[in-house]
Amino acid sequence: MDARFAILRRMNVPYRQIRASFTDEAITVYQAYDPAVAAPAVTAQRFVPPFKRERMTWIKPSFLWMMYRCGWAEKPGQTRVLAVDITREGFEWALGHSCLSHPDAGTDPTAWRNRLRESPVRIQWDPERDPHHNALPYRSIQVGLSGDAAARYADQWILGITDLTDRVHDVRQALRDGKDVTGMLPAERPYPLPAELARTVGASVTPDAG
């Protein structure tokens, strides 16, 4: 196992924690597309047709979860990996207007269904992955944008789009060569969530499964 992930397994990482690359103003999220969608987006520095804003689009702050999802850019329709820098204000707007895809234990089912129906944003917490796609004992957030949220993402939040596909191929080859790829990965750190947003998305406040 690569060094960083062996260490993380031994640490008390909160069960649900947002880890990301971010600055004071921006956070990087990842998406993978077919070249027909990715190439125009990189050229325009925003998502343009054939990107379909009427469909829910999922953004992922975890680079390695994106690699798990796209199979290191080898899955059909996901062969171009994009790093999308968006405003932290926009990202936190999405979290504040979100609903968990599945209710947590103890949630009032009627209240959850009402929020699910009204919210343009879905939150899922899935097992984080190491570079070899092995599940880690804590979760990574995926944020699904639809309706008003998808429009805001496409039109207002994006600060830049970078094609990472060549870098992804380099890391994939290093893995196949049996190398430790820790130093080749984007640096990610815990994202500071205001308490209200942490409650909305169901983030953990302690390193346990709660």
Regions found by a protein language model. Give the residues of each.
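Conserved NAD+-utilizing ADP-ribose enzyme module
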Residues: 2-27, 52-55, 72-210
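Glycine-rich loop/turn
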Residues: 24-64, 70-75
